[in-house]
């Protein structure tokens, strides 16, 4: 089984949290709402990976004013690829508390939508199990 280290930002701006809706046909949680983030590449430092993933998935215009390591956890997930193949992967999640100075988002093709969500509205979204667990640990669900 392949292992991936995943950097995952919990991004907050003016009391709202950023959620991204995965595309329907691929990824670990197709069609569900999630936090952004992705894999650390070989030789890449953790914060470099976090900033790269944010740039790739959310665009160059989003400015983070604060990044603080928060927690980590692991689990096993099945990833679905665009061609329909599936792979079981051991995931190690490194989760960061982040504050953004703005809300300038330009999502890439991994997502079909995004939303800045008030804490009391988070439970209204079809959150994937990993995001639900993370938000519950934070006391937001």
Curated annotation (Swiss-Prot):
InterPro entries associated with the record: Nucleoside_triphosphatase_NudI (IPR023781), Nudix_hydrolase (IPR020476), NUDIX_hydrolase-like_dom_sf (IPR015797), NUDIX_hydrolase_CS (IPR020084), NUDIX_hydrolase_dom (IPR000086)
Top EC class of this enzyme: hydrolase
Disulfide bonds: none
A matching Pfam family: NUDIX
Enzyme Commission number: 3.6.1.9, 3.6.1.12, 3.6.1.-, 3.6.1.23
Motif (Nudix box): 38-59
Keyword tags: Hydrolase, Magnesium
GO molecular function terms attached to this record: dCTP diphosphatase activity; dTTP diphosphatase activity; dUTP diphosphatase activity; magnesium ion binding
Nudix hydrolase domain residues: 1-141
Superkingdom of the organism of origin: Bacteria
CDD domains, alphabetized: NUDIX_NudI (cd04696)
Needed cofactors: Mg(2+)
Reactions listed under catalytic activity: a ribonucleoside 5'-triphosphate + H2O = a ribonucleoside 5'-phosphate + diphosphate + H(+); a 2'-deoxyribonucleoside 5'-triphosphate + H2O = a 2'-deoxyribonucleoside 5'-phosphate + diphosphate + H(+); dUTP + H2O = dUMP + diphosphate + H(+); dTTP + H2O = dTMP + diphosphate + H(+)
Subunit structure: Monomer.
Membership in a protein family: Belongs to the Nudix hydrolase family. NudI subfamily.
Function of the protein: Catalyzes the hydrolysis of nucleoside triphosphates, with a preference for pyrimidine deoxynucleoside triphosphates (dUTP, dTTP and dCTP).
NCBIfam families documented for this protein: PRK15472.1
Protein name: Nucleoside triphosphatase NudI
Gene: nudI
């Amino acid at each position: 089984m392949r292992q991936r280290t995943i950097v995952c930002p919990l991004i907050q701006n003016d009391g709202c949290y950023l959620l991204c809706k995965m595309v329907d046909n691929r990824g670990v949680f197709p069609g569900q709402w999630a936090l952004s983030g992705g894999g650390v590449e070989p030789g890449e430092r953790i914060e470099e990976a976090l900033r790269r993933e944010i740039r790739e998935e959310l665009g160059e215009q989003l400015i983070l004013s604060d990044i603080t390591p928060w927690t980590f956890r692991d689990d096993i997930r099945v990833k679905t690829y665009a061609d329909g193949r599936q792979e079981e992967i051991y995931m190690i999640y490194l989760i960061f508390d982040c504050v953004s100075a703005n809300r300038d988002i330009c999502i890439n093709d991994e997502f079909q939508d995004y939303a800045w969500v008030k804490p009391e509205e988070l439970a209204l979204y079809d959150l994937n199990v990993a995001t639900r667990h993370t938000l519950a640990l934070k006391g937001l669900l």
